[in-house]
Amino acid sequence: MTTLTAQQIACVYAWLAQLFSRELDDEQLTQIASAQMAEWFSLLKSEPPLTAAVNGLENSIATLTVRDDARLELAADFCGLFLMTDKQAALPYASAYKQDEQEIKRLLVEAGMETSGNFNEPADHLAIYLELLSHLHFSLGEGTVPARRIDGLRQKTLTALRQWLPEFVARCHQYDRFGFYAALSQLLQVLVECDNQKG
């Protein structure tokens, strides 16, 4: 990625972590359709690989704003996709895709982080991977820890996430009736691939 700073990438990961960790409330719903968010999206679209995914997300947000009871409908989508059995869902856990659920714990220890007691989900939840990537990008931007060490950890985290993210995204596309979370997961996948190519 060329135009986005480490801090901006960190913000995108943190934002995605938040949206995948819990249902949207009214305030978040208003925020994603705001002019401020449109500016943020236009900044992301200045990164060519992200353009199509951001356009897709904006389209799903535009459709969302005309839905009756949008928040309740979206909550139902969230629940059906991420909290039910895995038969017709896209469970956001590494272990649901036969990956080592301990790997993220090792990466968190290496980064000097731990999961928050406020987040009542297993450590291998997608949001934890994204929070870790956000933290690492912020650290890269600050320059207080040697970049090589942070970069190595970022690469390990991306490698672990890329083991199961494509299947998660495919399941979002398959089972998300409305398409908001499918579009969100598509943006995440493109971001992760761009981040990975950064080396």
Swiss-Prot record:
It comes from the Bacteria. Keywords: Chaperone, Cytoplasm. InterPro entries: Chaperone_TorD, DMSO/NO3_reduct_chaperone, HscB_C_sf, TorD-like_sf, TorD/DmsD_chaperones. It holds the Pfam family Nitrate_red_del. GO terms for cellular component: cytoplasm. It is found in: Cytoplasm. The keyword Magnesium does not apply. Involved in the biogenesis of TorA. Acts on TorA before the insertion of the molybdenum cofactor and, as a result, probably favors a conformation of the apoenzyme that is competent for acquiring the cofactor. This is Chaperone protein TorD. It comes from Escherichia coli O81 (strain ED1a).
